Every structure is written in structure tokens, then in C-alpha cells.
Amino acid sequence: MTTDINDRALLLLGTLSLSDLAVTNSKEYVRWQNIKRGSARIAATEIEELGRIFPNYRYWLISGEIMPKAGQTSPSYDEANEKLAGPNAG
């Protein structure tokens, strides 16, 4: 289970390409690249940006908790629900 906000942010960041986040070779692109490679720490502004990109994961990203009835889930919750809804479930 991912418990640290930085770990949760990096998990979401891993699902994106750098071009999803910024224009190639821009200052922001290099910043995201450094974060992804582990040579820079993620800051509040990047956490906010990930929250805008993944609005359904916003609460989980900040708190580590989910509220499915409010549409606030996590990647692992969504993955488990997809498997349950699949044709070979159960």
C-alpha cells in the first residue's frame, strides 16, 4: 500500500508521459523529467497539477484515503473494480 504523498504522486506520474505534462524542452518539462528520474523532489505545485490531471484521484493523492461514493478513488481501487466487472470475475 502506498502511504506517502510523494509515493502516490510518483505512482500517478509514472502513468504519464512527459509530453502530457509540459512542452518538450521547456523549463517545466525538465522539472518533471528530474522528478520522474528521482533527481528532484516533488513540490506542492506539482501535486496540485497532478490533482488537476487526475481529479478522481485528488482526495487519495492528498490523504491516501478514498471516498468512492463521492467519486474519489485510487488507481488500485479502480483496477480492482475493473477486475470485478470483467467477464471472468468471480
Region locations from a protein language model:
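DNA major-groove recognition helix of helix-turn-helix/homeodomain DNA-binding modules
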Residues: T45-W60
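Recognition helix of helix-turn-helix/homeodomain-like DNA-binding domains
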Residues: S26-I42
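A short, basic/aromatic helix-end/turn motif that makes direct DNA contacts
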Residues: T24-K27, P55
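A short, Lys/Arg-rich alpha-helix, primarily the initiator
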Residues: M1-T24, Y59, N88-A89
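Short, conserved clusters of charged catalytic residues that mark active-site
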Residues: D4, I42-T45
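Short, charged recognition helix plus adjacent turn
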Residues: Y59-G90
